Amino acid sequence: MSTTTPNIWIAASDGKTDVVLKHLDSGISPNAADENGYTPIHAAVSYGHSDLLKILVERGGDINIRDQDGETPLFVCEKLEIAHDLINQYNADTTVKNNDGLIAAQVIEANGEFPELAKYLYSFTDLEPKDVNTLPNDTKIEYAKLMTEQEMDEEAGQPLLDQKAKAEIDRILALRDTGVNVDDELRKILTGALSGHFERNVRPRSN
């Protein structure tokens, strides 16, 4: 009974180093891209195969190679230790922007699954996280005012808030002036507004 050898991208995803090496020895580039621009390096990073990543880089892999969405392997990273190696050992560029104008830290933050990883990536940039859950209460108040005053996101060219959200923030701020504690309400609406903004700009990640 014959078996089919998995292609290099599946082998890299599964961490099958021996199969990946056979593909490399047969002449396939570590930078070979599938129809979506996805490379073996993207796969190794996404699934956390550090030993395989090392081999791919040693065989000429480009750590900052982009897929069709303009995303480098750093964008699909899910583990702190892999991110550490990408940046400190392989010199991955944390400032690369994808086709939507977002850096890896912003994309990972927007996905919401790996907040510590996003925070780590932000530490290598001049940008600040937009997660309002990490903001002090007074800062949430000022952030709410800023979002109602700033009509457009300059990078995306889209409204930061719709009219309904602006009206709700105005209502909450008015309640605060009467002495009512509105921190939880502000947190919820700001989180929702930011999530909606990112959903318009970030493609869903898939395994």
UniProtKB/Swiss-Prot annotation:
User: What is the protein's given name?
Assistant: Ankyrin repeat-containing protein P1E11.10
The ANK repeats are found at 36-65, 69-98
Q: What is the lineage of its organism?
A: Eukaryota, Fungi, Dikarya, Ascomycota, Taphrinomycotina
Record bears the keyword Cytoplasm: yes
Q: Enumerate the subcellular locations listed in this protein's record, separating them with semicolons.
A: Cytoplasm; Nucleus
Indicate where this protein is primarily found: cytoplasm
A single Gene Ontology CC term: cytosol
* Keywords noted in UniProt: ANK repeat, Cytoplasm, Nucleus, Repeat
Q: Which Pfam families match?
A: Ank_2 (PF12796)
Q: Which domain of life is it from?
A: Eukaryota
